[in-house]
């Protein structure tokens, strides 16, 4: 497993070289809107080491009916529903702008079956402006009805289908709703994944106090933010203990201390998600705080706790 340099903060996800270990979570930072608002200054001081796009699908999607968001006491429940312009719209309109960012571009894709995933990976993987592809495997397979990232029997054949289609790094985004996230990680690794990212949001809902009915238009959504951090840390530890693949840890990262906790659990990099909605400068702040913590810690050339799966037992419990 790749370590983070304590002197430069540099790290690596597969063949993707990163100046520091802080990324954005897909769909949590609108780089195109930020570029319009801040112009060249954003490029000069971009807050993330790589940019992960919103998830795109083959066909355009309007997303779920409103309301789509519920502010929980320690997080956010979203039921966005993957609204996007579709593959053609993304390539024509968004990709040319995102390609001007001063960091590697990771494009997140989701298909409702192997054929859709294959079309997306072939098209995006062939574009020289794209550095890596994140596979959002939280969608159901239209043939089996199963979520492709929830069961190893779904994840393995998907990766075996996609791996020969591109030489770009494939990052598989794992769902915390899987019955055995470690087994799904094993399947992704066996299928040829270059890295893993986790966690995605936790299934959740909210009730409208006035009506007693679900608040969200789609009924249910996904919980993110500080409320899921402890769960995310545990699952990152489980996965890091079972694979040598780089792991991007996410789920409630608000500070450099949170980021360091994920690195200690075995992550190679971290992603800031929900915190971006509260503080658009969160990525840069987390990076600075992390650097200060590491400098005060007196580590050597690499953060020794990173990639130390012996801290987590094979059964998934944190060793005392």
Predicted features, each with a name:
Residues 1-105, 110-112:
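N-terminal capping/small domains of soluble enzymes
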Residues 22-26, 49-53, 105-109, 133-135, ...:
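Hydrophobic faces of well-ordered beta-strands that scaffold small-molecule active sites
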Residues 33-40, 117-127, 178-191, 241-243, ...:
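Catalytic cores of alpha/beta
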Residues 53-58, 136-139, 195-205, 252-253, ...:
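Glycine-rich phosphate-binding active-site loops on the catalytic face of alpha/beta enzymes
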Residues 64-73, 207-221, 263, 275-300:
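C-terminal helical cap(s) of enzyme catalytic domains, especially alpha/beta-barrels
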Residues 76-77, 139-153, 184-245:
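Glycine/Thr-rich beta-alpha phosphate-binding loop at enzyme active sites
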Residues 108-111, 174-180, 229, 245-257:
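Glycine-rich beta-to-alpha transition loops that act as phosphate-gripper elements at the mouths
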Residues 229, 284, 288-320:
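Extended, intrinsically disordered, low-complexity segments
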């Amino acid at each position: 497993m790749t370590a983070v340099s304590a002197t430069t903060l540099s790290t690596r996800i597969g063949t993707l070289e990163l100046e520091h270990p802080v990324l954005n979570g897909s769909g949590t930072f609108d780089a195109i809107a930020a570029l319009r608002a801040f112009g060249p200054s954003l490029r000069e001081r971009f807050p993330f080491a790589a940019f992960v796009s919103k998830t795109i699908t083959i066909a355009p999607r309007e997303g779920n009916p409103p309301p789509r968001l519920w502010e929980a006491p320690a997080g956010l429940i979203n039921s966005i529903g993957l609204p996007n312009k579709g593959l053609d719209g993304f390539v024509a309109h968004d990709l040319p702008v995102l390609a001007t960012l001063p960091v590697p571009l990771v494009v997140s894709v989701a298909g409702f079956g192997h054929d859709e995933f294959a079309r997306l990976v072939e098209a995006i993987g062939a574009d020289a402006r794209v550095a890596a592809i994140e596979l959002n495997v939280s969608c159901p397979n239209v043939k089996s009805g199963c979520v492709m990232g929830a069961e190893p029997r779904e994840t393995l054949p998907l990766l075996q289908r996609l791996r020969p289609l591109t030489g770009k790094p494939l990052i598989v985004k794992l769902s915390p709703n899987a019955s055995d996230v470690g087994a799904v990680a094993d399947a992704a690794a066996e299928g040829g994944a270059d890295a893993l990212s986790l966690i995605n949001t936790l299934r959740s809902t909210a009730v409208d106090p006035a009506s007693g009915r679900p608040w969200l238009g789609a009924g249910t959504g996904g919980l993110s933010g500080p409320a899921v951090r402890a769960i995310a840390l545990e699952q990152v530890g489980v996965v890091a203990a079972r694979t040598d693949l780089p792991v991007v840890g996410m789920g409630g990262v608000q500070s450099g201390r949170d980021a360091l906790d994920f690195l200690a659990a075995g992550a190679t990099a971290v992603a800031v998600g929900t915190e971006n909605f509260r503080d658009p400068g969160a990525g840069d702040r987390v990076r600075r705080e992390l650097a200060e913590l590491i400098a005060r810690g007196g580590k050597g050339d690499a953060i020794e706790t990173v990639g130390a799966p012996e801290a987590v037992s094979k059964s998934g419990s944190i060793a005392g």
